[in-house]
Amino acid sequence: KKAEDAIEKVTVNEIQLTRDGEENYSYAVFDRGDTDDKRKRDKGKRKRTRIYWAKDSKKFASIRSDQRKSKELWVVHSVKNKRPKLETYKYDMAGDKNVTQYEIDIHDLATQSILKLDIKKFKDQRIGVYSGRQFRYPDSDKPQQTVWLAEDSKKLYFYRQSRDMHKVDVCVA
């Protein structure tokens, strides 16, 4: 009971960090596994994002995926449902000309500014941010916070990988 009362007393001050949201050009983690019906029901709900915090919490990095030109894939869920349900999502297949493009942004909380990293090297590359390992109790309801690998907010370690997976660069920004 005390914990519930404490949660209700917490004041949350939300700050909108971006104003450039667009369907299929997202900061959110992919929501594969949801049927189209469920996706429509949950349209206004918040989605998990790919955010990596600096250990000093002064900055965070986000990965944004641009799938506006990617083609859709359809999956029919027919096993556990009385009637088949459709799941539609963007998926890059071998040979596709238009595939997901990725960006890394660094958000500075003190200045409320966003630095878009110039990371382009390989055509249709994949990217990722190196993060530290975190222990998490399976029954914990605490939000998961991914922390980037560097000791402070002055450096960010990331990788870029060619689409054919033959080349990988380890980078620092």
Show the residue positions of the predicted features:
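Predominantly five- to eight-bladed beta-propeller fold
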Residues: A3-Y52, S62-K120
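Extracytoplasmic beta-rich repeat domains
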Residues: N24-D34, K123-P143
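Blade-terminus and WD-like Trp-Asp/Gly-His loop motifs, strongest in beta-propeller folds
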Residues: K45-R46, R50-K59, S131, S140-D141, ...
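Catalytic cores of secreted or luminal carbohydrate-active enzymes
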Residues: A61-R64, V147, S162
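Short glycine/acidic-enriched loop and turn motifs that connect beta-strands
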Residues: Q67-S70, S162-H166
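A short catalytic or substrate-binding loop motif that flags glycine-/basic-rich loops and adjacent residues
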Residues: D96-N98, S140, R163-D164
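A detector of repeated loop/turn-to-beta-strand junctions in beta-rich toroidal repeat architectures
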Residues: Q101, K167-D169
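Segments forming glycine/polar-rich beta-alpha architectures that bind adenosine-containing cofactors
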Residues: H107, L117-I119, S153, Y159-R160, ...
